[in-house]
Regions:
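N-terminal secretory signal peptides that target proteins for export/translocation
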Residues: 1-3
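Bacterial N-terminal signal peptides
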Residues: 7-17
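SH3-family beta-barrel domains
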Residues: 22-64, 75-79, 86-89, 96-101, ...
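Intrinsically disordered, low-complexity polar regions and short flexible loop motifs
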Residues: 67
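Beta-strand-rich domains and repeat architectures in extracellular enzymes and scaffolds
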Residues: 70-72
Length: 180
């Protein structure tokens, strides 16, 4: 529903003596349009951009452009490291790492598994998503852990007995608004 239809609904609602109904309809429609317009989709996959993935390979050349003919700027050597996809071009994905370095990787070097890198000096993993919860494990800066789920401000990381909740502010690999 475009802005003309929204305006027409407001005028029609007001003319029929139902200003509250017109206002409610308008705010719902405008909100839905803004939410849909805010999501940027990748030209190749149709998936949201930016989005997080992890490095499939134990060694990957981070290139200056989307082809093997482009210069290698960095060599990534940590299988499972979280990366943020910021653009797509054919079979190539522009990614950003936790340090802010960017470059292009072939899509086959990436996987959809979600991981997080600890950015805090020491991270307490907790039994629940609360600062008051019991500490179940600790991780140091740079440790990479699988993400099980995320809520508003917390993510459950790890596997088995070394799993626990961590505040999103202490990790890199999940956006502030993400829940899954």
């Amino acid at each position: 529903m475009g802005w003309r239809n929204v305006a027409a609904a407001m005028v029609l609602g007001a003319a029929l003596g139902a200003p509250a109904a017109a206002e409610a309809s308008t705010s719902t429609t405008v909100s839905a349009e803004v939410d849909a317009a805010a999501v940027v989709r990748g030209s190749e996959t149709g998936l949201p951009l930016p989005r997080y993935v992890s490095l499939r390979a134990g060694r990957a050349n981070l290139r200056r452009g989307p082809a093997t003919s482009h210069r290698v700027d960095w060599v990534l050597t940590r299988r499972g490291m979280p990366l943020e996809i910021t653009a797509e071009h054919g079979l190539w994905r522009r990614v950003r790492d936790a340090d802010g370095e960017t470059g292009w990787l072939h899509h086959s070097l990436l996987r959809g598994d979600r991981t997080a890198m600890v950015t805090a000096e020491t991270l307490d993993l907790r039994a629940a998503a609360s600062e008051d919860a019991v500490v179940t494990a600790r991780a140091e800066r740079g440790v990479i852990l699988p993400i099980q789920t995320c809520v508003t401000d917390w993510c459950r990381l790890g596997a088995g007995r070394t799993a626990g909740w961590a505040p999103k502010a202490a990790i890199w690999g999940a956006a502030a608004h993400e829940t899954f």
